[in-house]
């Protein structure tokens, strides 16, 4: 059984017992979170597609940890002008473990 959920403006295909990194959620480590924006639920050949969401479907997850991704370096460079600007960015994430899919 799997589902497609929306979190942080992105769509994720999830299965029960799977861990994934989402955009940062304001939930403490060890807490639980429910995703009610479920776009698709599939159980074998039984597939429910929402328009836009599946009514009554929800995915529950447990927050495992918070952290930051690897650094992304941004460089702006003007050729022949002796001008270069460097900037780095590390995006926050929340790692969750999917505990249940209903729907």
From Swiss-Prot:
GO CC annotations on file: cytoplasm; ribonucleoprotein complex; ribosome
UniProt family annotation: Belongs to the bacterial ribosomal protein bL21 family.
InterPro entries per record: bL21-like (IPR028909), bL21-like_sf (IPR036164), Ribosomal_bL21 (IPR001787), Ribosomal_bL21_CS (IPR018258)
Name of the gene encoding the protein in the UniProt record: rplU
Subunit structure: Part of the 50S ribosomal subunit. Contacts protein L20.
GO BP annotations, alphabetical order: translation
Record-linked Pfam families: Ribosomal_L21p (PF00829)
Protein source organism: Marinobacter nauticus (strain ATCC 700491 / DSM 11845 / VT8) (Marinobacter aquaeolei)
Name of the protein: Large ribosomal subunit protein bL21
Annotated keywords: Ribonucleoprotein, Ribosomal protein, RNA-binding, rRNA-binding
The keyword Chloroplast is annotated on this UniProt entry: no
GO molecular function, a single term: rRNA binding
Function in brief: This protein binds to 23S rRNA in the presence of protein L20.
């Amino acid at each position: 059984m799997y589902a497609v959920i929306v979190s942080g403006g992105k769509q994720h295909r999830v299965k029960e017992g799977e861990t994934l990194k989402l955009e940062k959620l304001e939930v403490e480590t060890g807490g639980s979170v429910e995703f009610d924006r479920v776009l698709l639920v599939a159980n074998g050949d039984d597939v429910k597609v929402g328009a836009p969401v599946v009514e009554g479907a929800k995915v529950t997850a447990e927050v495992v940890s918070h952290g930051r991704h690897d650094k992304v370096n941004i460089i702006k460079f003007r050729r022949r002008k002796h001008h270069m600007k460097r900037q780095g960015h590390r995006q926050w994430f929340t790692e969750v473990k999917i505990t249940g899919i209903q729907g």
